[in-house]
C-alpha cells in the first residue's frame, strides 16, 4: 500500500503519521501493537475516494511516549496534525485499544469531528492490574522484551502461516477453531501474517493498559457527532459490554453487531459487509 510517512514536532514531542489515498479525510486511531502502517479496512475506503491519516499513537512507531502522558494531551497533538495538514474536520475511526483516543478526541474537539466510528473498540476500563492478561502484557510487551517477542512471532508466522493462524486466531475469538474455519476467508491467513509482521508494542501498549480507565461517562455523553459502533458478537479480546456501554451513553449512537469470526472484523466471509456498513454510514 502506497503511503506517505512523516513526522511533526510540537512542544518538544514528535508525532509520526502516514497519509494514504486522496479525497475526504479520515483520521484513524489504530489499535494496540499497531502504528501508522496499519491497513485493515483501508483499501475499500481508498477506492471509494477517502484519504486516510494514521498517526502512530504515543509510544508506538516514532511517536514520543511523552505525548501520551494523558489522552487529552495526545489529542492536542492530533489537532496540531490536522492544522499542519490544513484539514478543518475529519471522520474518525477508532479501533480496539485506540477507542479511548477516538472518544476523547470527539468529545473534546467536536468542531473537528464529522463522525466517529468505533470498531471492536475499548470504551471503558478494560484490563486491570488484577487480570492475568494485564500482568502478562506488562511482562511480554514492554521494551526491550517486546522487540524479541514480535520478531519471534513474525518469524514463526512467515515460516508457518497456516499453523500460526490456527494457533493464534482463537485468542481473537470466543469460537473454537473449527467454527472460525467455517467463517474465515482464505485471504485471512495472509492478512494475519502481514499483521504480525508489522506489529510492535514499543512503549505504547503499556500506555494503553494504563489509560483505559481514563474514559469517563462525561466524555461519552459530550459526543455530539453521528456515531457508529461496530463489533463482532464473537470478539474474544474486547468484551461486548464495551459496545453496549458506548451505545448507552452516546446520544443517538447506532450499534451494529457483526457475525465475523472475531475481533478482526475486516477478515472473514463477513468482511465485505463490514466495509459496506461503514461506507454507508460515512456517506449518509
Swiss-Prot record:
InterPro entries: AB_hydrolase, AB_hydrolase_1, AB_hydrolase_fold. The keyword Hydrolase applies. The keyword Protease does not apply. One of its GO terms (molecular function) is hydrolase activity. Its EC number is 3.-.-.-. The active site is at residue 96. SUPFAM superfamilies: alpha/beta-Hydrolases (SSF53474). Gene3D superfamilies: alpha/beta hydrolase. Keywords: Hydrolase. Residues 25-123 form the AB hydrolase-1 domain. PANTHER family: BLL5160 PROTEIN, HYDROLASE, ALPHA/BETA FOLD FAMILY PROTEIN. Belongs to the AB hydrolase superfamily. This is Uncharacterized hydrolase YcgS. It comes from Bacillus subtilis (strain 168).
